[in-house]
């Protein structure tokens, strides 16, 4: 995060909603993350921006064995050029009220050294001194980081035209990694959704992930984690290959957008406190392993280059400046991630108008943890999207499932030799026939069928909103999906980038109601809801009962810790006083549902 002046970043959102965020905001110093899982979408977006900025991009032949990685590299190189172009144009501007150059500095946090220098500049009356300071400020302008994300779970094996399996380097995630590694970007790659050893091991093939002769790393590694143990395991694995984790990005398991990877009842404050208490262990454990690798390779190991701890950032459900300040001041985080609120900032993200309207008008009941993902992982969803309606219409017309045009999420081999997607027409036809043949009541058959009908073609539909917004695809042929976190309900209109940034930094009037419960309340409720579903879906074996008991104990301990936090002093724009009464309701729910539990040995399906 060198030369990054802001205390927040815009996380990855879907495959398409932040696909061009760096083009929109990086020249203004704001860092954001793009998904690089969908090279088909990326190729279309690349063509669009190549034409818009008159920057030629070489077309990649479909027959090219490295087509996927080359498409990704082409787009990332294009984004790099566009951001550099926009930043240079910004630098050439004079400091004038209301222009983009002034906006760059107005967006900065008030306590940053660059903002203070800018404020001092505004007070200078001597023209010569003002001109010198203006040049100094201009030289200090840097773009936000153009970061990318790979979901570690999305790592499909690919096949040659003759049906033979291609070598591991051509799997989806590794090809995407190659695409980033061979780009011109100096930024970071975020790995999310679990620990993929072969994927992380593939990093060692590319020199940009190692320190150069000057001790600098061109491409840094960020690991998204949900607990300290995961950070330690993945960090050690990388260290044995001489690779450093520059940042651990901690995310709430349920109070987030997209796929939800619930912890075993651990709430965010407890997780953050453990990171704070044990932070020094990270570098202490990793550096000796990195040093050993360097020595084996006969590389120079400069102690001073390695005497820093990984950065810690946090995201998931943060909705006020006070909550963000607590993350930084009390838990020692270096910055915060703000995702879903930026879906309502057209200057920053790419959301089609119909979906934008749904987001602005969304009520609590419109946001739900669904079984829509073909990965079998709970998925944060919004009701009445084009995707949801399209999926329902197909099921009701007797033609359930998607043609599966992209196939990134294929994983099931119940009916085929090669994996297929559970949202596909092929899978659902087989599944419906299987259910229809079962000797059970028709009502139960319908219930089982509906569980599978709920699966959505996320590969295609998460990309469509961006294609519609940019005028690349018509909305009549592009059902659009979106995956906001529950926090979006407190934001109810379109916002300018200045408004949202001011809200994050606590400048001016808050964009959310003063009655909004604290983010910790939201997370508690989500975990109690999740536990309630576990009680009626998990089996009755000794191991499963033990799992429930540990989950409940962790949840109760986390709630007690949050109550303790609520007794302290609140930061401005932080609703700590909402916690005690809210917690009492959830504690009563938890106690009541556990007393009435009737575990059933059926599959979990959220």
Regions found by a protein language model. Give the residues of each.
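Short, composition-biased local secondary-structure segments
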Residues: 144-150, 199-210, 280-299
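Glycine-rich phosphate/ribose-binding loops and adjacent secondary-structure elements
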Residues: 223-233, 239-391, 396-397
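Long, compositionally biased, glycine/small-hydrophobic-enriched stretches that function as flexible linkers
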Residues: 1-199, 366, 370-606
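Extended, well-ordered protein cores
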Residues: 169-223, 234-240, 247, 251-258
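Short, basic, glycine/proline-bearing loop/turn elements
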Residues: 159-163, 217-223, 310
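Membrane-targeting and insertion segments and their boundary/processing signals
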Residues: 15-19, 208, 260
């Amino acid at each position: 995060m060198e030369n990054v002046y802001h205390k927040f970043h815009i996380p990855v959102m879907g495959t398409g909603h932040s696909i061009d965020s760096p083009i929109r905001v990086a020249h203004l110093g704001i860092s954001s993350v793009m998904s690089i899982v969908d090279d088909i979408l990326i190729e279309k977006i690349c063509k669009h921006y190549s034409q818009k900025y008159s920057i030629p991009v070489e077309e990649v032949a479909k027959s090219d064995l490295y087509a996927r990685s080359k498409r990704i590299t082409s787009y990332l190189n294009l984004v790099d050029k566009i951001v550099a172009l926009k930043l240079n144009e910004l630098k050439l501007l004079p400091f004038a009220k209301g222009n983009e150059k002034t906006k760059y500095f107005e967006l900065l946090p008030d306590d940053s050294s660059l903002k203070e220098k800018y404020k001092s500049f505004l007070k200078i009356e001597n023209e010569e001194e003002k001109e010198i300071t203006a040049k100094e400020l201009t030289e200090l302008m840097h773009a936000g980081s153009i970061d990318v994300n790979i979901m570690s779970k999305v790592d499909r094996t690919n096949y040659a035209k003759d049906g033979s399996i291609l070598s591991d380097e051509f799997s989806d995630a590794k090809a995407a990694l190659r695409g980033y590694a061979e780009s011109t970007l100096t930024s970071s790659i975020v790995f999310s959704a679990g620990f993929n050893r072969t994927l992380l091991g593939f990093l060692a093939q590319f020199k940009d992930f190692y320190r150069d002769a000057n001790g600098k790393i061109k491409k840094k590694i960020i690991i998204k984690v949900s607990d300290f143990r995961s950070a330690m395991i993945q960090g050690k694995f990388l260290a044995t290959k001489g690779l450093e984790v520059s940042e651990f990005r901690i995310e709430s398991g349920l109070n987030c957008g997209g796929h939800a990877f619930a912890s075993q009842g651990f709430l965010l404050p407890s997780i953050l406190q453990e990171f704070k208490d044990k932070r020094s262990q990270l570098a202490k454990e990793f550096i000796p392993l990195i040093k050993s690798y360097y020595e084996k390779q006969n590389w120079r190991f400069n102690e001073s280059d390695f005497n820093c701890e990984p950065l810690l950032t946090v995201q998931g459900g943060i909705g006020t400046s006070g909550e963000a300040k607590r993350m930084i001041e009390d838990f020692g985080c270096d910055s915060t991630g703000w995702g879903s609120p930026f879906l309502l900032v057209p200057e920053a993200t790419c959301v089609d108008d119909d979906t934008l309207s749904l987001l602005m008008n969304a009520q609590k009941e419109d946001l739900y943890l669904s079984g829509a993902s073909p990965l079998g992982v709970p998925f944060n969803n919004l009701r009445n999207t084009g995707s949801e309606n399209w999926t329902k219409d197909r099921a009701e017309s007797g033609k359930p499932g998607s043609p599966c045009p992209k196939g990134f999420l294929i994983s099931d081999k119940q009916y085929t030799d090669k994996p297929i997607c559970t949202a596909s027409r092929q899978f659902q036809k087989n599944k419906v026939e299987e259910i229809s043949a079962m000797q059970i009541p028709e009502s139960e058959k319908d219930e089982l069928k509906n569980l599978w009908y709920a699966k959505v073609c996320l590969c295609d539909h998460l990309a469509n909103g961006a294609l519609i917004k940019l005028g690349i695809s018509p909305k009549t042929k592009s059902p659009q999906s979106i995956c906001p976190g529950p926090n979006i309900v407190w934001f109810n209109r379109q916002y300018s980038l200045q408004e949202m940034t001011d809200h994050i930094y606590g400048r001016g009037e808050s964009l959310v109601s003063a009655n909004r419960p604290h983010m910790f309340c939201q997370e508690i409720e989500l975990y109690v809801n999740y536990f309630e579903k576990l009680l009626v879906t998990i089996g009755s074996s000794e191991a499963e009962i033990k799992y429930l008991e540990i989950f409940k104990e962790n949840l109760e301990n986390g709630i007690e810790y949050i109550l303790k936090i609520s007794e302290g002093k609140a930061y401005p724009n932080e609703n700590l006083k909402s916690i005690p009464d809210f917690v009492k309701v959830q504690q009563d729910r938890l106690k009541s549902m556990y007393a009435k539990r009737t575990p059933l040995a059926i599959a979990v399906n959220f």
